[in-house]
Amino acid sequence: MLHIKMTISTLLIALIVLLIIILVVFLYHKKQQPPKKVCKVDKDCGSGEHCVRGTCSSLSCLDAVKMDKRDVKMDSKISSCKFTPNFYHFTDTAAEQEFGKTWHSIKITPSPGESHTSQEICERYCLWGTDDCTGWEYFGDEKDGTCNVYTNPYLALKYTKDHVLYLPRNHKYA
């Protein structure tokens, strides 16, 4: 009987030592990971990092979109995008309009003396408007085209040749 008690107490001590080792390793590992830097714009982050959902990240543009725009659905043919200060920029992409989606179509024809491109005019329209602008799309050439300003937060992106689509970064609908 005495032999069984010693074995149980030995197992109990071994279990306690094992739990202490696991706790020390966990705390050491957690201490080694640098805290995520809080940001509002890309300039707040280090080289090669971008501000995604309020923290600096080295995610690719497509991965950042998937993290920032949780409800966005993307066509598998969309293989890249790029960061701009206020938007995720896609080329050869269009927003698929399903039932219930809303947008405003604006014909853009800059005057000859205008210093801004048609795409810059679309971007400014989206930024100047309310927070309801969830993205914009431009199709046309440099002289004449159409700007669709989206006001519904649930977009589905499909591959379409010669379309340019921008989704706001760090937006309230993310």
From Swiss-Prot:
The main place the protein resides is virion
Name where it's found. Answer: Virion membrane; Host cell membrane
Q: Where is the signal peptide?
A: none
Task: Cite the entry's keywords alphabetically.
Answer: Early protein, Host cell membrane, Host membrane, Membrane, Transmembrane, Transmembrane helix, Virion
Kindly list any coiled-coil regions of this protein: none
Virion surface side residue ranges read: 29-174
Triggers of expression: Expressed in the late phase of the viral replicative cycle.
Topology with respect to the bilayer: Single-pass membrane protein
Q: Which residues lie on this side of the membrane: Intravirion?
A: 1-7
Q: Where are the transmembrane segments?
A: 8-28
Protein family (similarity comment): Belongs to the asfivirus inner membrane protein p22 family.
Q: How is this protein named in the record?
A: Inner membrane protein p22
